[in-house]
Design a protein with these regions (language model features):
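Enriched for short, Lys/Arg-rich terminal
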Residues: 2-4, 17, 58-65, 69-102
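Arg/Lys-rich, positively charged N-terminal/basic patches that mediate binding to nucleic acids
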Residues: 1-31
Length: 102
């Protein structure tokens, strides 16, 4: 059964902000998650950031990171953040979004 890939509102905004060619590469990676959600690497602690339970997937020659989690009960891959790794920026943003009250 294929997974449904959903982007949080913030991740959708990240996606819209990408250049066209990068957007195509990210979209290609997101489509792969539909059939292979375990494709990305497990994240744990990144410095002071605890991203245990989340995964990362590379795009655009490893310049872009996609941070996501797998929701097995719903058969969903939820994308939390998309962005550059520079100074752990995408991981900091993902952690901030995870910790933010709904």
């Amino acid at each position: 059964m294929p997974y449904r890939v959903i982007l949080t509102a913030d991740a959708a905004q990240d996606f819209r902000a990408l250049d066209h060619s990068v957007k195509e590469q990210v979209a290609r990676q997101l489509r792969k998650l539909e059939t292979s959600p375990q494709l990305g690497e497990h994240l744990g602690r990144k410095g002071e950031l605890d991203l245990t339970g989340y995964h990362k997937l590379y795009a655009a020659k490893r310049a872009i990171r996609i941070v996501y989690r797998i929701l097995e009960v719903e058969v969903v891959v939820e994308v939390i953040a998309i962005g550059k790794r520079e100074d752990l920026a995408v991981y900091r943003e993902a952690a901030r979004r995870i910790m933010r009250p709904e």
